[in-house]
Amino acid sequence: KNYSIFNKRVGPDTHIIRYGEGMANTFTVLEQLSWAFENKNIEKNTWYYSPKEEARNDLGIRNQTLELLKKIKIFIITVGLSEVWYNKENNQVFWKAIPANKFNEKKHGFKLSTVEENTNNLHQIYSIIKKYVPNASVIYTLSPIPLMATFRPQSCITANSVSKSILRVALDNVMSKNIDKKDLYYFPSYEITKEYFTDPFKEDNRHLKNEYTLKIMKIFEENYCC
């Protein structure tokens, strides 16, 4: 079907390819789009692929990201976390938890983001894409992968339920307010996993079994790729 396939080893040097699956909150998705399209100033030394690998914030990567984004016809944006770590000094939200050797209690904080914050971010994500790539479509999805841990003083099971619920309500807010848009969609991968399949997860109880991933992708293909 003439699709371009990129991964960490193949394709342009961009963070959304190298670490796209780690950008699971709405703040970081919006930040990458604002950085690429609008040259938003981002504080250095705040992006991490892993505890030992810092992601570069330089003009070369930004330009490659911009060129890649301008060519996209369909943006598939999956969100999964409403629990976030952030910079107390400027409210910048990080991709993931701060590496232990970089953590500063006075500077770094943890919070459960709100429905309102995520609704606003999702609206802005759609708006900035349409501003700079007007012919593109946007498909939002909610990741069914549950939290592995929480920094809230409660069970990870209950924290995950709250985290997903916040995002699902935010997504519903955006879709309800843009019901007339013909280029904005929600694909229910979360609901298919939770409500349709009876035993979809691997032994780790977090990641989908391969056959269920293929079933979901088949449903997606039938609705969006034909």
List where the protein language model places each region:
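Extracellular glycan-modifying ectodomains
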Residues: 1-226
